[in-house]
Amino acid sequence: MLICRLIVTIATWLSAYVRGALSSRFILGVIGPLTNGSFAVGAWLAVTHLPTLYDVRRTWVSSLASARYNPAGYAYLGTVFLIVPLLLVPLPGYLSGCFRASAIRRAGFFLLWFGIVGLFLLGVETTIFPNPGRTRFSHQLFTTIAFIGITPGFLAFSLLAWRRAWIARTSLVPAALACAVLLLPGIGA
């Protein structure tokens, strides 16, 4: 009886997690820091295992995740690409629940899911099938899917937040900052 209740409780929580039916406190206090921390730790581990001294002026960021020149960094960042999409799973549902129904909300929802799936597939491809040779088409495809989905998906929700702030005559700085931060990965790619 206790095991059945435990299973039902876990299943209920996982269902709420996937639907994004979580509190703002959990999303902002747990998911956000874990996602950012995962990227930071993965990048730090990749830099510390780079065989040469990392100099941002002379070394490409992609060399941190090179299976040929930095296999340990490649493995660490591949693991991050497995963890981060799992952490991002509740965001499309949560963010959709923050705004009224519209075409941009639906587009943001689907783009964000598309990017999360692409990032997870990139993590699987990088971690399970490391390639010290030339870059495979699948790697380029999953990277493109992740960028095409995540950046515009977050941008759509940032624009909705900006619009809401504009209509309510509140500060536009948080929404504008979110838009700027979320455009950087797309510009860098």
Residue ranges with predicted function:
Residues 157-189:
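Terminal transmembrane helical module of multi-pass membrane proteins
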Residues 115-162:
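Membrane-proximal helix-loop-helix units in multi-pass membrane proteins
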Residues 94-107, 160-171:
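Membrane-interface helix-boundary motifs at transmembrane edges
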Residues 64-85:
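Interfacial helix-start motif at the membrane-water boundary
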Residues 5, 80-90, 146-157:
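Hydrophobic cores of alpha-helical transmembrane segments in multi-pass inner/ER membrane proteins
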Residues 1-22:
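Short, Lys/Arg-rich, polar N-terminal cytosolic tail immediately upstream
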Residues 23-49:
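N-terminal signal-anchor transmembrane alpha helix
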Residues 44-67, 122-128:
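Hydrophobic transmembrane helix segments
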